[in-house]
Structures are given as C-alpha cells and as structure tokens.
Amino acid sequence: MEISVASVTVSVVIAVVTWWVWRTLKWVWFQPKMLESYLRRQGLSGTPYTPLVGDLKRNSKMLTEAISKPIRLNDDITQRVVPYPLQMLKTYGRTHFTWLGPIPAITIMDPELIKEVFNRVYDFQKARLFPLARLIATGLVRYDGDKWAKHRKIINPAFHLEKLKNMVPAFHQCCSEVVGAWDKLVSDKRSSCEVDVWPGLVSMTADMISRTAFGSSYKEGQRIFELQEEIKELLIQSLGKAFIPGYHYLPTKGNRRMKAADREIKVILRGIVNKRLRAREAGEAPSEDLLGILLESNLGQAKGNGMSIEDVMEECKLFYLAGQETTSVLLVWTMVMLSQHQDWQARAREEVKQVFGDKEPNTEGLNQLKVMTMILYEVLRLYPPVTQLPRAIHKEMKLGDMTLPAGVHINLPIMLVQRDTELWGNDAAEFKPERFKDGLSKAAKNQVSFFSFAWGPRICIGQNFALMEAKMAMALILQRFSLELSPSYVHAPYSVITLHPQFGAHLILHKLY
C-alpha cells in the first residue's frame, strides 16, 4: 500500500511538473513563435522575438539613454519621449509589430484603421498588460463590454455641459488661489519673478478635482493624491519585471507598498462615499458635485443594473487620477508654449481681455474663447498627455486587409500620429494653432489624425471638463501675468504615465497690473 501511494504521489508530481513546464514553454516560446509566423505570412514586418522579454530591454535601454539629457525647445520630442517606437517606425514602416514581452503588438499609423479600432469597442478591448496597474485606477477607463456600457451610461450625466456649468465657480476659486500665490511672489520681487509653475499647477488641478468631485478641499483629498503618486512611481519601477509569471503576487517591498497604499486609498474613499450616502438618506447631501451626480444617476437605475459601492469607489479613484493628471500636463505645456510663442500669447490675452476685461471669467465667456481653444488643441496635438493607447484581440478578426489572431495587441501611437508629416504636413512638428481655426475635423487630412482624448464610443468622458478647467486657468493667468521662459528652463518632457516636465517648468512671470 505504501509503495502504491508513493507511486501515485510521484506520478501526480511528475504530471503537474510536466504540465507546468509545457504551459511555460508554450507561453514563452511556442505561442509567440506561432503568432510571429502568422503575422509575417500576412506580410507584416517587425522585430524578431526574444524569449520572454521581447523588445522590453531594448526599449528600456533606449528610453533611459534618451531621458538622461534634455533637448532644445525646437527639437523633436519624439526622440526623447518615444525613441524606440520612433526607430521601429522608421525601420519597419507604418504598420509593423514589436514585442511586449511574449505578446506581439501591431503599431498602426493609418487613421482609417485607427478609426475602425475605436469604433469596434467590443472587438478591440482594453489591454491588461500590467496587473498591478489596477492599483492606480480601474473604473470606466479599463472596463470592456457590458460593464463598460453600464458604467458609461451611469457616469455620463456627471459630465453633461449643464452640470459642468455649476462647477465653474469651483474652478475659479481653485485657480484664483494658485494665481494669487504667484501674484504675491511676483509682487514681493517688484513685479517680475522666476517661478516653477509645475508644482502650482499640480496643486491647482488636484484642488479642482477634489472640490468638483467630492465637494472637499485639496487638504482633505491630498492624501489620496500622495498615495496615487507613490503607486505610480513604484509601478514604473516594476515595469521591467511585469512579464515575469506571477510577479505581481510576489511579496516584494514595492508590491507590498503598492498594495498597502491602495488599501489606504480605499479606506479614505469608502469613508467619503459612506458619509455621502448617509447624508443623502438625511436629505442633506449636495448633488452638484461629480460624486453626488454619480450616486443620483446610479440610484435611478433599475434594480440590479446599478453599480456596487466598490464600483463607485473605483470610479472615484479614476476621477482623482485622470481629472488631475490630464489638466495639469495640458496647462504646463500650454504655459511653456505660450512663453516661447509670444505672438500667440498676445493673441490669447487680447481675446481674454475682449471677452472678460478684468472681470471674473464665466461659463458663457469661456465658451467664446476660440483662440484659446485653438491653442489648447495644438498643445494636445504636440504634447498629448498619453503617448499611446493599447488594445487587445481575444478572437481572430479582420482589420482592414489583415486577419489577426487572438493574443495579438494593437498599438495606437498617439504622439507619432499627431506629429506625422503625411497627415499634418511638413510643418507637423511646429506650433501652429491656426490649424484648428475651422475645428478638429478640418485640421488634418483625416479626422482620426487627432485622438488625444481617444475617439469614437470610448472618447474620454471628461474631455469637456478638462478643457473648461484649462480655459479658466489660462484666462486668469493671462489676465494677471505675461509669461516668458526663464534662462534656467530645461526642456525635458518625459512620460510618467502622463507627459510631465522632468525638471519642472521655470518661467518668468511679469505682473500686468
């Protein structure tokens, strides 16, 4: 009996080990090589597969070298921000594949194919390359299928233009506090002063999302921002290990800290949501902020079709992350560009003066700022907050003339497309807001040559929110100051999930009155 039990045990162990080895070999070698062969038979060119790591090491090495030194203002920032994708585009052409570890990713530059990917939301779904990324935020931006459709329907009322009008006073208050602090600095220095505007813009946009999302001040929401920033930094440090099987389960120092920070965020958010629910029951809850509108819309759904408390908390995390990141980077690059291009700064200020004089900006006036809108679109074109969007294929399907197998990813290279001379002309790298004088649809040869906010059914639900914030901030700044680049300004855009200024944004602010 003992021999038979031992034999069975050994047999089971051998079977499990054999199965595990086969699964690992299939994942690391056989599956990628099969997909590579399939893609090459389709006529696609790309990099040869390197087991497990793919192109990650080459990409990381090139990026590390690129961000080790700043560039000149008129240099092409793609060489610094996306050096490896740029080199692959030059080497393999406008449709090619590279490797995200063992996963082939097809980069497409054709706007018609990009449009097809955006429109077929149930076929081309969100890629989930890094399991730990869910700690930053999940919510609407990461959901697919019916869950995405349900959440989009519930959240949509919060970003209706009529609702945004009610948030404009909060935008003004938050902007005024930071602009007022800059004004004091400049006044203390006799009307002219060098300021690193980046920390102030981060604080301003954090305050705006805290007040408009939760009716709370920046100080109450500050801990959430600190924790999300810490998770972002730790996540970026771990990207090189993302394709090690089960890495996100390992109790490394970084993994433990990320999960602890996420738990703390959830405790804070659960407290905010539960407090609001109790206030609603007592008839005392505000309903004009994003959380109030979200809860009201959620309660209006038929039983079983609403969101759980956990779902609401995830959407709150997303409000914080996306609401703060997108607008802060848009504002910092707008201030840098206007400091460099004094003619457009003068035009924008003159428009603000004509619409508002020295009065407080309001919703109606912000909607009349055509020059400012052109400038913001051009900044978004040249400095998109996110440089690329990945999509995943889960079953064989057609895309244009290609037949693509399950297991392949699609890469939509926002920055490369929006600086492409074939689509935007030979002056594609130049700052020319006049491109947008007739709106987005006529700015380039193809409508889907601009997708900083994505496009189609999954277009960013908060784009009007972000643009309204940015217009308010820039109107107040231009009313109060003229801007120029400081001699100490260092041009060094780099991607930390969104496109940050690596060494801040040192500008000279001149007080106008």
Curated annotation (Swiss-Prot):
Coiled coil: none annotated. Its EC number is 1.14.14.-. InterPro entries: Cyt_P450, Cyt_P450_E_grp-I, Cyt_P450_sf, Cytochrome_P450_Monooxygen. GO terms for biological process: saponin metabolic process. The chain crosses the membrane at residues 2-22. SUPFAM superfamilies: Cytochrome P450. It is found in: Membrane. One of its GO terms (cellular component) is membrane. Pfam families: p450. It is a single-pass membrane protein. Keywords: Heme, Iron, Membrane, Metal-binding, Monooxygenase, Oxidoreductase, Transmembrane, Transmembrane helix. It catalyses: oleanolate + reduced [NADPH--hemoprotein reductase] + O2 = hederagenin + oxidized [NADPH--hemoprotein reductase] + H2O + H(+). Its cofactor is heme. Heme binds at C460. Disulfide bonds: none annotated. GO terms for molecular function: heme binding; iron ion binding; oxidoreductase activity, acting on paired donors, with incorporation or reduction of molecular oxygen, reduced flavin or flavoprotein as one donor, and incorporation of one atom of oxygen. Belongs to the cytochrome P450 family. This is Cytochrome P450 72A552.
